[in-house]
Amino acid sequence: MIQSHVSVMLNEMLEALSPKAGESYLDCTFGAGGYSKAILESCNCYVTALDRDPNVIKRAEEIQQNYGERFDFVETNFADSFAKLKEKKFDGIVLDLGVSSMQLDIADRGFSFLHDGPLDMRMSGQGLSAEEFVNAAEEKELADVIYKYGDESFSRRIAKRIVEYRKTARIDSTGKLAEIVRSSIGFRKGKIDPATKTFQAIRIYVNDELGELEQFLVNVKNILKKDGRLVVVSFHSLEDRIVKNFFKENSEKPVVRSKYAKDDMTIDPNKWLKIITNKALAPSDKEVGLNIRARSAKLRAAKAIYE
């Protein structure tokens, strides 16, 4: 059963995407369908949604029943979507890089340190699981992954404790891993759960989330129409840095050759984006108060000025 999910920065996403009737949009991270539904309700437009999680298919079918041919769903991760989308181009593309409540709140999915379940964390159910990684990786690799993808300053201490624990028993549940992490660094008053960063790091690693994001951005120009908008909502500094650098590297203000000829400008055709959000947008205090999972969200948007 899919749990209730609250889409993060929904209004800001719609404002940045600016959907128009008759146009086509790509929701690269369907999840519980919050973004897709909001775009479809905003005007008489079309949405193609992607997700590698087979558990969302039922929700996609529900939306398709309501919106008919205006909605289409493709089961794939966004990095591998280009072949399945063939030569289709879109007027706008949106990515919500966060983990949905339907993944976090269902214990059997193995994402949550709050709900005990099998230590899995795979979004597609395929490939290396968190259990396999945690029980097989060398101490240094564990520490490096937890530090790099979780920005966890206690990564070495946590990795050492994991290796010590698995000498006596296999770490096969989220509850076990969470307790190992907590016992390594302890609770700090007013701080997030000590297991938060470690679980984030392992999830990012086993799903190759950053690699998929980088691969998608390299190819996104091929599916975004001229004047089409790219909107990305990220949830931690590594994702945001990738998006920020991509926007910066692919956008450039026109250079005026002469102060007397303002229309005489040279433009690098490889700089195909115009940044819409000069700085990353953050959720309002009100939204964070209603949905604590929004606290780390950042939204960046850009527009294609060339195809």
From Swiss-Prot:
It comes from the Bacteria. The keyword Methyltransferase applies. S-adenosyl-L-methionine binds at residues 33-35, 51, 82, 96, 103. NCBIfam families: 16S rRNA (cytosine(1402)-N(4))-methyltransferase RsmH. Keywords: Cytoplasm, Methyltransferase, rRNA processing, S-adenosyl-L-methionine, Transferase. It is an enzyme of class 2 (transferase). Its EC number is 2.1.1.199. Belongs to the methyltransferase superfamily. RsmH family. Disulfide bonds: none annotated. This is Ribosomal RNA small subunit methyltransferase H. It catalyses: cytidine(1402) in 16S rRNA + S-adenosyl-L-methionine = N(4)-methylcytidine(1402) in 16S rRNA + S-adenosyl-L-homocysteine + H(+). GO terms for cellular component: cytoplasm. The gene is rsmH. GO terms for biological process: rRNA base methylation. One of its GO terms (molecular function) is rRNA (cytosine-N4-)-methyltransferase activity. The keyword Transferase applies.
